[in-house]
């Protein structure tokens, strides 16, 4: 019993149950988004977040923009528009984040409470630092900056080339299905203990089971079904499909029937 990853006592939380697996950060670069207020050194007091955000698209250059309060599991509830491509944004932002980050496919996760994730289909959203974004390493090939270099140095056990190669083997929709599963919530609890916050390091260290193309395709098809349903009707109940994903996830992690009952609260 000491190896059961779902045990929630502090003693048993530090388990090595899935030590042989790659972790999420081996597949994805994980980062906060931009901070849309003026940099204290470059433009002290010139503008605040509210000055850059509009409910509507207008003549000012803008991009679609989301915050954590706008997302939920498999959906984006609200979109606003952030000034972007002007003299002050992103040039004078306190944290602009590198521009290539906003032009590739990403998963988005919240930073407080229960983990929820969604998917940027068309690489079209800016997001602020209330959201943790994740992009496959392969999609950042050729992008060089201090943020990426520092992240690899601090958090990675693999080389960038190795992670880029590894990320060729997964689909973001597969990872989304894993991360939105009940078991991922348990794994997150194991990592953060009683903390209400979710940090990039928590996301990076969630173990991810290796899956064949066929195994991934099952989860991808279910995720696509949910995403398509939510696009048509954001309020649609997709709990049955999510339960199907949970069942696939349990198999990939090799959970026993008894462990599944614990995760399911039965």
List where the protein language model places each region:
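Ser/Thr-centered flexible coil motifs
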Residues: 7-11, 212, 256
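Short, Lys/Glu-rich amphipathic helical modules
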Residues: 230-240
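Short, flexible/disordered secondary-structure transition segments
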Residues: 186, 190, 233-234, 259-260
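Hydrophobic face of alpha-helices
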Residues: 176, 220-223, 242, 246
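Polybasic, glycine- and aromatic-enriched phosphate-binding surface used to engage nucleic acids
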Residues: 12-214
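Conserved AMP-binding
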Residues: 240-266
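Domain-scale recognition of functional cores that engage charged ligands
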Residues: 1-2, 7
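Amphipathic alpha-helical segments
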Residues: 207-232
């Amino acid at each position: 019993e000491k190896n059961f990853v779902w045990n929630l006592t502090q003693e048993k939380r530090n388990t090595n149950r899935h030590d042989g697996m790659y972790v999420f950060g081996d597949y994805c670069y994980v980062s906060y988004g931009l901070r849309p207020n003026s940099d204290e050194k470059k433009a002290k007091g010139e503008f605040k977040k509210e000055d850059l955000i509009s409910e509507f698209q207008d003549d000012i250059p803008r991009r679609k923009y989301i915050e954590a309060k706008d997302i939920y599991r498999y959906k984006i509830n609200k979109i606003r528009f952030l000034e972007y491509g002007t003299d002050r944004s992103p040039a004078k932002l306190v944290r602009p984040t590198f521009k290539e980050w906003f032009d590739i496919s990403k998963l988005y996760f919240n930073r407080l409470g229960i983990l929820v994730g969604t998917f940027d289909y068309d690489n079209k959203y800016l997001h602020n630092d209330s959201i943790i974004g994740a992009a496959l390493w392969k999609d950042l090939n050729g992008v060089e900056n201090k943020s990426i270099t520092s992240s690899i140095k601090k958090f990675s056990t693999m080389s960038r080339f190795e992670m880029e190669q590894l990320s060729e083997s997964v689909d973001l929709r597969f990872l989304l299905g894993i991360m939105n599963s009940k078991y991922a919530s348990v794994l997150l609890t194991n990592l953060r203990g009683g903390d209400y916050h979710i940090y990039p390091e928590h996301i990076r260290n969630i173990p991810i089971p290796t899956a064949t193309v066929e195994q991934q395709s099952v989860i991808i098809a279910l995720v696509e079904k949910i995403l398509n349903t939510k696009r048509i009707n954001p309020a649609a109940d997709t709990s049955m499909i999510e339960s199907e994903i949970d069942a696939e996830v349990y198999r990939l992690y090799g959970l026993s029937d008894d462990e599944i009952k614990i995760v399911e609260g039965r």
